[in-house]
Amino acid sequence: MTQLNDLPLQSLQFYATAPYPCSYLPQRQARSQVATPGHLIQSDIYSDLVTKGFRRSGMFTYRPYCDGCQACTPLRIVVDGFRPDRSQKRAVARHGKLQTRVLRLCFVPEHYQLYLRYQNGRHAGGGMDHDSIDQYTQFLLQSRVNSRLVEFREVDDTGATGGPGVLKMVSLLDLLDDGLSAVYTFYEPEPRCSYGTYNVLWQIAQARALSLPHVYLGYWIAVSPKMNYKAGFHPHEILTDGRWHRVDMPL
């Protein structure tokens, strides 16, 4: 367990939740360690917590605290030295013409409708496919840290259609002291698309432009098919036994 006795983390308290069904491994129970009080967790403290394996969901800052299981491994991409592989290059070729717009956190009905299509198309029956506007807002639009929404739109090359273009993807990210943190991304559930991969590549490019060394992808679970893609970005680092360990691309 990472030590949390360094200032300013001494001002925080940490408690463990009751067990609840694991979202990633069937037949498993999960627990989380939650950092409180929330009003003290501003951008600087949150940046420190992320380096120690914490994430946030809305206003809650947490990390896995499961009994007898350590499958969730924090993973961050090392921006300096990153080189895309063939499949990642194909994602850029497929989606590289998407136009982006960065927004402060705000409710946009078009985003919410895309979110519902994504949940129903990619995670039907997962419990989020019928989220209300309030649930969506609490999950994605509440933050005490430096957060942004990023729109990705497909625009007609001819410009004949006018307007902002067709919304294809929305990403929520946090700006940390040492990188970007990919909080959540949802997109049009089209067959043979690579929106998720392209989004990570876009964040790597943004981090490089901002001279930030890392892109945090949250938790990687080696035995979860949903999480396998995270380990495909090299070099990356994983947090084990309280220390970050580098993983380079296999030869």
Swiss-Prot record:
Catalytic EC class: transferase
Cellular component GO terms, alphabetical: cytoplasm
Reaction(s) this enzyme catalyzes, per UniProt: N-terminal L-glutamyl-[protein] + L-leucyl-tRNA(Leu) = N-terminal L-leucyl-L-glutamyl-[protein] + tRNA(Leu) + H(+); N-terminal L-aspartyl-[protein] + L-leucyl-tRNA(Leu) = N-terminal L-leucyl-L-aspartyl-[protein] + tRNA(Leu) + H(+)
Subcellular location: Cytoplasm
One Pfam family cited in the UniProt record for this chain: ATE_C
Chief localization: cytoplasm
An example Gene Ontology biological process: ubiquitin-dependent protein catabolic process via the N-end rule pathway
Keyword Transmembrane helix set for record: no
Function, in words: Functions in the N-end rule pathway of protein degradation where it conjugates Leu from its aminoacyl-tRNA to the N-termini of proteins containing an N-terminal aspartate or glutamate.
Keywords: Acyltransferase, Cytoplasm, Transferase
The keyword DNA-binding belongs to this UniProt entry's keyword annotation: no
Name recorded for this polypeptide: Aspartate/glutamate leucyltransferase
HAMAP family in the record: Bpt (MF_00689)
Assigned EC number: 2.3.2.29
Gene Ontology molecular function, alphabetical: arginyl-tRNA--protein transferase activity; leucyl-tRNA--protein transferase activity
Family the UniProt entry places it in: Belongs to the R-transferase family. Bpt subfamily.
